[in-house]
């Protein structure tokens, strides 16, 4: 399988591979910073231009999964969020291997920021883990927007 590897990421397993062998979930990894760098590369137009970039942006804005994660605290604001979720299986200890959300936020004043929250081996419920991501999203939004 062809993949992407760097000092801050190692991604070479497909979703199907990870469902068949849970150990593969731990072989695919990145940092939140590296995930945001990749997203910025895509959204800024450096990776794709014109219709291709617009397609990526609109696909992420229309994402319906994980509305209880990064988008949750933004629902009452005029910010626009595009995001993509990732949810892993439970390991042998009953932990959720990975609950993730990465996205970009357009503020009403025209500024934009990107955010990635990656939760590994959560012992919480799916709802409580989503709430952790939402809480981080809210804190970042309040800081960046100045709504403290």
Over which residues does each language-model region extend?
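Flexible, solvent-exposed loop/hinge segments and secondary-structure transition points
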Residues: 15-23, 29
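Single conserved hydrophobic/aromatic residue that forms the stacking wall/gate
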Residues: 1-8, 12
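Alpha-helical hydrophobic/aromatic positions enriched in membrane-embedded helices and signal peptides
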Residues: 1, 23-25, 78
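Structured C-terminal helix/loop/strand segments within mature extracytoplasmic catalytic/sensor domains
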Residues: 27, 31-148
């Amino acid at each position: 399988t062809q993949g992407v590897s760097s000092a801050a990421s190692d991604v070479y397993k497909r979703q199907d591979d990870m469902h068949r062998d849970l150990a593969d979930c731990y072989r695919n990894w990145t940092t939140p910073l590296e995930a945001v760098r990749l997203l910025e590369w895509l959204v800024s137009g450096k990776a794709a231009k014109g219709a291709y970039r617009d397609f990526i942006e609109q696909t992420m804005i229309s994402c319906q999964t994980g509305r209880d994660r990064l988008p949750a605290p933004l629902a009452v604001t005029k910010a626009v969020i595009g995001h993509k979720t990732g949810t892993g299986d439970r390991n042998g200890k009953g932990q959720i291997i990975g609950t993730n959300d990465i996205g970009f936020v357009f503020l009403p004043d025209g500024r934009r920021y990107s955010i990635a929250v990656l939760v590994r081996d959560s012992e919480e419920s799916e709802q409580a883990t989503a709430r952790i991501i939402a809480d981080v999203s809210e804190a970042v939004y309040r800081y960046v927007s100045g709504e403290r």
